[in-house]
Structure formats: structure tokens, C-alpha cells
Swiss-Prot record:
<feature type="binding site">
    <location>
        <begin position="331"/>
        <end position="333"/>
    </location>
    <ligand>
        <name>UDP-alpha-D-glucose</name>
    </ligand>
</feature>
<dbReference type="Pfam" id="PF00201">
    <property type="entry name" value="UDPGT"/>
</dbReference>
<feature type="binding site">
    <location>
        <position position="279"/>
    </location>
    <ligand>
        <name>UDP-alpha-D-glucose</name>
    </ligand>
</feature>
<feature type="binding site">
    <location>
        <begin position="348"/>
        <end position="356"/>
    </location>
    <ligand>
        <name>UDP-alpha-D-glucose</name>
    </ligand>
</feature>
<dbReference type="GO" id="GO:0008194">
    <property type="term" value="F:UDP-glycosyltransferase activity"/>
</dbReference>
<keyword id="KW-0328">Glycosyltransferase</keyword>
<feature type="binding site">
    <location>
        <begin position="370"/>
        <end position="373"/>
    </location>
    <ligand>
        <name>UDP-alpha-D-glucose</name>
    </ligand>
</feature>
<dbReference type="InterPro" id="IPR002213">
    <property type="entry name" value="UDP_glucos_trans"/>
</dbReference>
<protein>
    <recommendedName>
        <fullName>UDP-glycosyltransferase 76C3</fullName>
        <ecNumber>2.4.1.-</ecNumber>
    </recommendedName>
</protein>
<keyword id="KW-0808">Transferase</keyword>
<comment type="similarity">
    <text>Belongs to the UDP-glycosyltransferase family.</text>
</comment>
Length: 450
């Protein structure tokens, strides 16, 4: 670790698994470059401070009831958090800045900046009131973050419903490489409340001092990056895949089942299909049964993450599946994906999961559910051609067929070869002189001299 540079960075993650992990990864990177780290966090989904003894953690009340913490409506959850957290956040930030001003001698540290998630829409005016630079951390693909702001316009232009079912495969010119049927799925899940929320994210991001993409690099987002720099007119840093700087490091909100690693050790190389749909997605009993039968019938060993509460019923079937594979409540995903036994990944295509799979060179079967997952799946299957896309209804024979195709010596081999090339390109980005490595150094220099 570099010697302390006398600067402190304040981080404020959204309390979601897909946001906390990247923020803590960024904290570790900055700390290794000499910055002191303070993490402000909510009571809900609080990170485990004991896992990170070198950081200072400050908890603020979030106003959520027990019922509200169990909601699957992410838009509602974010609305409630933004409504309840502004006052306690301002109070916490005031105390931090006053404390920094009162320090003297060798103990004195200057607070360089605030780094928080784009989903916090009150933090920009709060930071401005203290003349504190705010940088926005983003965990989406650049193209999604840039283009999803056109969704309210597309809603107004009446993409819903399609006049002709055959139009479903037509491209969406304003949002490539989405197809119209993908867009309908996104718009169908959206609401006018989310449109308003997205507009506020856009406004506060443009008013910020910079934009950090921790899970992407120029090799994955080059065209969108040049357009985003024109749109936002703020410095943009693409430093990902950020997990590569501290391999195996995790800030999971779930208890990890480490027994899956010894199980993988006993499997043949490239033989196991890993199945995980992230920390938020839930599936119904019918969908669960179709996936279960597909895995059972594929004759391929599998490791399946089935979170507690993520499946409606179907629990009695889980025991019967253990003879064909292994089922766990949560897995150390980065460690799993880099294991030599893993040959494929059946995924929801959250961006973090997609990038982790690319970084380890694991081909994917794409089963997107919501939001940016649909765009990410299109890039995997249609642009990079490093996976297969499950479209339409979830049916056992279709999933089984895709597993067989992915592990075949014909189509599967071609997919694996393309994935290996993409893996090498992304891997070079985080090495010295690589695009992400250079961008990280630019970020360090930028926040050092505020």
C-alpha cells in the first residue's frame, strides 16, 4: 500500500448487493493508493464493517419499516430511501467536515470528495452546499446508462403495443442493439414514476464533478464512451473490471457456501454449468421446475445458486436434484467463475455478473429478466457472440438444448474461441498501460488535486 497522502474520500453506496460490492472494491483500490476511506451507509443492508478494518464506517437511519425492507419493487425502495436519507446524510456529512476542519498537525486530513451511486438523487445539491466535489459511481454498462434516458421519449412515441408481432425482431435505432420486443419488456416494467426518477439521475449526474464506471472498460464500451463524453461534459473514468484489482475479495450481504469449491474440485475441467440469477431476481414455481428439469435432463453437472426466498415453492424438488449437481444458497461467484471446472454460466445478465464471466472467459446462456439485463444479453449473444440467448417462455427442452449446444464441439467450440479473444482484450485493459489501468491513474490524479 502507498503511504497515506493526507486525503480522505467519503463513499456512500446504495444498499443493494450489486452496488455495495463495486463501491467496496473501489474503496480498496483508493486505499491502496494512499487515501483514507470513510463509508457512510444505511441501516438496511449495512456492509460488514468487521471485514474491512482499515475503513471507517458510519451508519445513518434510513426510515424503512420491516415490511418495506422486504419489497421486491426496487423503484419504490429507492424512492423511500431518497426521501428518508437526505436529512441524516446531511447531518453526518456536516460532522465529518467539521471534524476534518478541527484536526491539526500530522492528524489533519483533507476530505477530497464524495463518491456515491447515481441512484442517490439528493446528494448532488447537498455536496454543492458544502462545496464538496461529488463523483458518481455507476455499475451499468456505459451504453445502457447513456441510452436509457431516452425511454420516456420512446414511451411517448407509442412503442407499446406493437402493431405487428413480426416487428418484435426489428432493431431499436435509438437504443442499439435492443430489439423492439426487448424494449417492450423494459417499458412494460417501467412506470412514469421511474421516468421521473431517471430524469433526476440525468440532471444530477450532469451537475457532478465526474462519472466513474467500475465495471467496464474501453474494450467493452468504446463507441458509447465517446458519445457519453459529448453528452455529459464531465470527466468519465472507466476503471473496470474493478474486481480484478483484488481477486477473490467480496462484500457479500449473503452468507457464502464455501462447500461448492471442494465439490468443483472433483469435477472434470470445463464440465460444469453454473446457474445464478443474482441477488434480486425471483422465479416462480413453474419456471423453477422448467429450469430444474432442463438441468436434470442435460446430463451436465451443475452448480445452482437458489437464494432463500428467491423461489416460490419448489423447495421439495431441490433435494432430488443433488444427485445431478450441487445447490447452494449463495456462492463466491468470482472464485466459482475462475474455477477450471466451470464451462458455462446460465445467468440473468446483470452487468457485474456479465463482466465477471467475460473476465474469466466463461461462455453464457442469457436469461434476462428486467431492465439493463436485456441489453447486456443482446451484447453477449448478438454483438460479441460469446453466448446463447434464451428468448420467450422458459421451457425445459429449450434450456436443455442450449446447454447441450454450449458444451458441444461445434457451436460451443466457436463460442468458446470468441470468448477467449474477448477475455484477453478485457484482461489487458487492467494491466499496466491498459485502458482501465490508465483511466484509474487519471482518476487518482483528478481527486488528489481537487
Amino acid at each position: 500500500m502507498d503511504k497515506s497522502n493526507g486525503l480522505r474520500v467519503i463513499l456512500f453506496p446504495l444498499p443493494l448487493q450489486g452496488c455495495i460490492n463495486p463501491m467496496i472494491q473501489l474503496a480498496k483500490i483508493l486505499h491502496s493508493r494512499g487515501f483514507s476511506i470513510t463509508v457512510i451507509h444505511t441501516r438496511f443492508n449495512a456492509p460488514k464493517a468487521s471485514n474491512h478494518p482499515l475503513f471507517t464506517f458510519l451508519q445513518i437511519p434510513d426510515g424503512l419499516s420491516e415490511t418495506e425492507t422486504r419489497t421486491h419493487d426496487i423503484t419504490l425502495l429507492l424512492t423511500l430511501l431518497n426521501r428518508s436519507c437526505e436529512s441524516p446524510f446531511r447531518e453526518c456529512l456536516t460532522k465529518l467536515l467539521q471534524s476534518a476542519d478541527s484536526e491539526t498537525g500530522e492528524e489533519k486530513q483533507r476530505i477530497s470528495c464524495l463518491i456515491d451511486d447515481s441512484g442517490w438523487i439528493f446528494t448532488q445539491p447537498v455536496a454543492q452546499s458544502f462545496n464538496l466535489p461529488r463523483l458518481v459511481l455507476n455499475t451499468y454498462k456505459v451504453s445502457f446508462f447513456r441510452d436509457h434516458f431516452v425511454l420516456p421519449q420512446l414511451r411517448r412515441e407509442m412503442y407499446l403495443p406493437l402493431q405487428d408481432s413480426e416487428q418484435g425482431d426489428d432493431p431499436v435505432e435509438e437504443f442499439p442493439p435492443l430489439r423492439k420486443k426487448d424494449l417492450l419488456q423494459i417499458l412494460d416494467q417501467e412506470s412514469e414514476q421511474l421516468d421521473s426518477y431517471s430524469n433526476m439521475i440525468l440532471e444530477t449526474t450532469k451537475a457532478s464533478s465526474g462519472l466513474i464506471f467500475v465495471s467496464t472498460c474501453e474494450e467493452l464500451d468504446q463507441d458509447s464512451l465517446s458519445q457519453a463524453r459529448e453528452d455529459y461534459q464531465v470527466p468519465i473514468f472507466t476503471i473496470g473490471p474493478s474486481h480484478s484489482y483484488f481477486p477473490g475479495s467480496s462484500s457479500s450481504l449473503f452468507t457464502v457456501d464455501e462447500t461448492c469449491i471442494p465439490w468443483l474440485d472433483k469435477q472434470e475441467d470445463k464440465s460444469v454449468i453454473y446457474v445464478s440469477f443474482g441477488s434480486i431476481s425471483t422465479i416462480g414455481e413453474a419456471e423453477f421446475m422448467e429450469i430444474a428439469w432442463a438441468l436434470r435432463n442435460s446430463d451436465q453437472p451443475f452448480l445452482w445458486v437458489v437464494r432463500g426466498g428467491s423461489v416460490v415453492h419448489g423447495a421439495e424438488w431441490i433435494e432430488q436434484l443433488h444427485e445431478k449437481g450441487k445447490i447452494v444458497n449463495w456462492a463466491p461467484q468470482q472464485e466459482v467463475l475462475k474455477h477450471q471446472a466451470i464451462g458455462g454460466f446460465l445467468t440473468h445478465n446483470g452487468w457485474n455478473s456479465t463482466v465477471e464471466s467475460v473476465f474469466e472467459g466463461v461462455p453464457m446462456i442469457c436469461m434476462p429478466f428486467v431492465w439493463d439485463q436485456l441489453l447486456n444479453a443482446r451484447f453477449v449473444s448478438d454483438v460479441w457472440m460469446v453466448g446463447l440467448h434464451l428468448e420467450g417462455r422458459i421451457e425445459r427442452n429449450v434450456i436443455e438444448g442450449m446447454i447441450r449446444r454450449l458444451f458441444s464441439e461445434t457451436e460451443g467450440k466457436a463460442i468458446r474461441e470468441r470468448m477467449e479473444i474477448l477475455k484477453e482484450n478485457v484482461g489487458r485493459s487492467v494491466k499496466p498501460k491498459g485502458s482501465a489501468y490508465r483511466s484509474l491513474q487519471h482518476l487518482i490524479d483528478y481527486i488528489t488535486y481537487f
